[in-house]
Structures are given as C-alpha cells and as structure tokens.
A protein has these predicted regions:
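Glycine-rich FAD pyrophosphate-binding loop
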Residues: 62-82
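C-terminal catalytic lobe of FAD-dependent flavoproteins
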Residues: 287-288, 314-419, 474
Length: 542
C-alpha cells in the first residue's frame, strides 16, 4: 500500500520537518484485530505483538501449542515498527567486549544466536524460500561500523579479530563508499535489511493461519502465577500453561527489571540524498557519534531514500527534542546532502548493564513465566533470537550455552558500579524532579503547543495547550513508580525519566512499564493578569 499522498517529500520546504510518523507505518498497513472475543484457556499467552512475541508465537504454533497474542496497541505498532530494521549480527563492537570480559566461547555463543536469527528470517522471505515466502522487502547487505578518527583503528581491528574468532563473516577494511572521510571500519558481509512492519504483519497472518489468535487493543495488567497461570487484562481473564512477556520493557515489577535496564531514545529521519550519497546500498554505524545510515526503497517513483538515526538521549530527560531533530537534519544535510525530510520518528530501546539481553525465566523460581528484553538497539536479530530461544525454553530444547548466557538472573560483580549509577540517576530524578515541580506554581498562561508541570494545591499537574487552545491536564506522576514526567515537545508526550514509560497528552500509555493511564485532572487556573496602573488622566500634547 502506498504512503499517504500528503507526505510527499517534494511538498514541503527544505527546512520543514513533517509530523512524526515512521516510514514503516506509512508504507504498510494491517487489518484491525480489535474487539475480538477472549478465549478462556490456551497453552501459551504471549503479551506483545512485536518481533519477540510474534517470533515465539510462530515457533510455538509450529510445535503444536495453542497460542494467544495480546497487544495493547496494534501489531508492530511499538518499538519493532520504529526501528531502522538492520538484520545483522554486527552489534557495534560487542565481540571484542564479550571476548575481553567473558572469553571467546561467550562471544561465539552470542554471535551464533544472532546468525541463527538472521538465517531464520532470510529462510522465510521471498527470493530465498521460493513460493510462499514472506515479501518483506528483504535485501542482502553488508554492515559496517566505522570511525573517522585515526585513533579508533586499533579498536576496530580488534573487533574484527574477535568477531572472526566468534565465527562471524567479519573483516577490517579501510575503504568505504561513504561520501565523507573515514579512517577504517569493521565489515560484516551477508547481512540484511528489510521492512519490519511487512515482516511482522506477515508473521501475524501466518500465526492466524496456523490457528493462533491475536487481539489488539487489550492491555495486560497482571499475571498470577500458578497452575494454571491467570492473565488479567482490560478485556478479562485468560488461563494459560505458559506466559511470555514480550512488551519491550517488562510490565511486571516482580523481576525488578526496572533496576537493571537503561532506557534510551534515538531520533530518526528519512529523505532523499544528494547524488554523491545516492549509491549507498549497505548499512553503516558511526562508532563515535552513533549516527546510523541505511537505504530504503523509494516511493512515488522517486529514488531510494536514506534512513538516518542519531541524537541518542535518555528517555524523559528535560531537553528540547525538537531542537535535537533539527540537529539530526543538519547532520544529514551536511554529510549526505539530504535536503528534504519525508518522515521522522523516534526509536526507544533498553540496554542491560553487560550488553547481553535478558531472555528466560521472569524471576529465578518462575516455572511458567518468561521474558525477553534488553536488546540494546539491535532488536531485529536480538529480538528474533529471543523469540526462538523462548520457544525452545518452553519446549525444553534450549541449548545450555544460550540458556546460561541470556539468563535474566545471571550475576556479575563487575556490573555493580553500573547498576549503582543507574539507580542513583533514578533516585535523583525521583527526588529532585519532585522538589523542583513542587516549587513551580502556575505562573504563566500557556500558549498553543506549550506545556508545563506545576503545583496546583497539593498535586502536581502536567498541562499542555493544543493548537485549538484546549488545555489537556493530567497527573504529573508516572503510574509505574510515581516519578515526575517531562514533556517531549516533538511528539507531544509525557515521558518518564526513571523507567521510560510514556503517555499521550490525555494520559493513555504509549510505552511501558506503566500499564495504567494517567488520571485526567482539572487544568491549572490561569495566573491573574497584572493590574493596570492608574496614573491619572492621560496627558494631551498640543
């Protein structure tokens, strides 16, 4: 399906940024799966219809299990639909890091899990599997991590060596086809890029074809462990033998994942490059600046566009996100000659302290509750690998080395300083933001597009005035653990700086771990207008 016509790149001035909408969401649409009846019993409930959940559901159905997928929004509407969609086992410089810290065997186990995920995707796509394959615009492509700094050559060479030892198709190169100078790079050959929504929508269709059920618009609020497991949701209860939490950020606090995950956001733009960059056909990551580049198929008969990611920041930080988008657009103009931006969106992810995802039992003694999270911005292969491993764990066929490596409850003394820093940042926000907001009474009348957190009586209110001058007011406390929210002016959302929950201007949950919406409240009273001074009758000059 073609994108909406009013988003054509040539209909906007060079300096205009479009409203946030991912290229993937604009170019692939799925059926409505809302308002469907909830079954009473199934073998497996999968919570979340992103790449982890749909991969696990597909495998479990093929293994003879009955499966229900519950999705709070819509299929591929979360993180998986806002990625750059690099399908690669190259995850920055992870192989040298894993080898140095844990040994070559751990690096090999990690890498082989990513290659297995890559192969599973490629094997099912059109042009690879023959008739009946999924058409997800998959293109075989090389992947590069590069640097423009001469001093980084040693790091890149060590990564290439460690990746080769781990069985990766890696090499160190000094020549790239980028239109700006580089000092060197690590190249992985035989990787891929695809359209994530087309892939996931096709998986969803396949799941239903195999007898599985998918229901959108249903938010899971609680899971009671036992025999059977009881899943509570906004649509009622379901009994299951196994439950997989595949919600990107785990929604149940019992695993204490919120103390061990670092949330981040990146901004993404898409546009037509200058001729000197129009030949780019591979995937590129700048080691120093974290800018990521990949091509994507053109629309409206226009040339291919480039997707550019950058401006890495911690979710909920009090900063001007719109200004960050402008900075990313300026970088793309300078380096790649992108004049017009056709789409922009943001990508959210979480990382673990050791860089290895959490895939396995939700808590140490859990028997039938499972989780996959912490992919550190490499969710296309990392999330697929998690879905494959979760299905193997439930079936009792998981390889021991993968089960141990990705165990969510592994412990490494070397992660303690990072954990302490992570939670000190949360504590600083919890206390400091509360104090700052409590001292902020409503002192100004909001203009259209403006927002503030202010004290009204004994409560903190998050208020936003839209373009029609309607004030939307909600509680300023995140419903997860009560942190004070910050306004994201680019996406008109209230974001939590503690654990990355996000809410729209009327309080609906956009991202977890929060599962409850913000309470809507009365708008703060407008501050009194200053009185005009009466200095007597006006003086007339003659």
């Amino acid at each position: 399906m073609m994108p909406t016509p009013d988003r054509r790149p040539d209909q906007a001035p060079d300096t205009t940024l479009p409203a946030p909408l991912s290229w993937w969401a604009d170019t692939a649409h799925g059926p409505d799966r809302r308002d469907r009846p909830l079954p009473v019993d199934v073998d497996v409930v999968v919570v979340g219809a992103g790449i982890v959940g749909l991969t696990a559901a597909t495998r479990l159905l093929a293994q003879g299990r009955s499966v229900l997928v519950l999705e709070a929004r819509n299929v591929a509407g979360g993180v998986s639909g806002h990625t750059t969609a690099k399908v690669t086992a190259q995850h920055s410089l992870i192989y040298d890091r894993l080898t140095s810290r844990f040994g070559a065997a751990v690096a090999r186990t990690y890498g082989q899990a990513q290659l297995r995920a890559l192969a599973w995707i490629v094997d099912q796509t059109v042009g690879q599997s023959g008739q009946g394959g999924i058409d997800a615009d998959l293109v075989t492509s090389d992947s590069y991590v590069f640097s423009s700094a001469e001093e980084d050559r040693g790091r890149l060479a060590r990564e290439a060596d460690a990746a080769q030892e781990a069985g990766m198709p890696a090499s160190y190169v000094t020549q790239l086809d980028l239109p700006f100078p580089t000092a060197g790079a690590v190249r992985f050959t035989g990787q891929a890029r695809f359209h994530p929504r087309k892939w996931l929508l096709a998986l969803a269709e396949s799941i239903e074809g195999l007898g599985g059920q998918i229901i959108e618009g249903v938010r899971v609020t609680q899971v009671h462990e036992g025999d059977p497991m009881i899943v509570e949701s906004t649509a009622g209860q379901v009994r299951a033998a196994e439950v997989i939490i595949a919600t990107h950020y785990p929604i149940l606090d019992r695993g204490l994942f919120f103390t061990r995950l670092e949330p981040v956001r990146d901004l993404v733009i898409c546009g037509i490059p200058a001729p000197e960059a129009a030949h780019l056909r591979h995937m590129y990551l700048d080691l120093a600046s974290h800018h990521s580049i990949r091509p994507v198929g053109g629309v409206y008969g226009r040339p291919d566009e480039l997707i550019v990611l950058g401006e890495h920041y911690r979710t909920g930080e009090r900063l001007d996100v719109e200004e960050r988008y402008e900075a990313l657009a300026a970088w793309a103009r300078e380096r790649l000659g992108i004049k017009r931006i056709s789409h922009r969106w943001s990508a959210q992810d979480v990382s673990t302290t050791d860089g290895i995802p959490f895939v396995g039992r939700y808590r140490p003694r859990a028997q039938h509750l499972w989780v996959g999270t912490g992919f550190g911005q490499w969710g296309m292969t990392g999330g697929t690998a998690a879905g494959l491993l979760l299905s193997d764990l439930i079936q009792g066929t998981a390889p021991d080395d993968e089960r141990e490596l990705f165990d969510p409850h592994r412990f490494d003394l070397r992660t303690i300083p990072a954990l302490a820093h992570r939670n000190s940042v949360v504590a600083a926000h919890l206390i400091g933001d509360m104090t700052r907001a409590s001292l902020n009474a409503a002192t100004k009348e909001l203009g259209p597009g403006q927002a503030e957190v202010c004290r009204v009586g004994t409560s903190l209110v998050a208020a936003y005035k839209d373009g029609d001058e309607v004030v939307h007011a909600v509680s300023a406390h995140c419903t997860h653990l009560g942190c004070v929210l910050a306004f994201n002016n680019a996406e008109q959302s209230w974001d939590c700086p503690c654990h990355s929950s996000r809410f729209d201007i009327d309080g609906a949950v956009l991202n977890g771990p929060a599962v409850a919406p913000l309470n809507q409240v009365a708008p703060p009273p407008a501050p009194p207008r200053p009185k005009r001074q009466n200095n007597g009758p006006p003086t007339h000059l003659t």
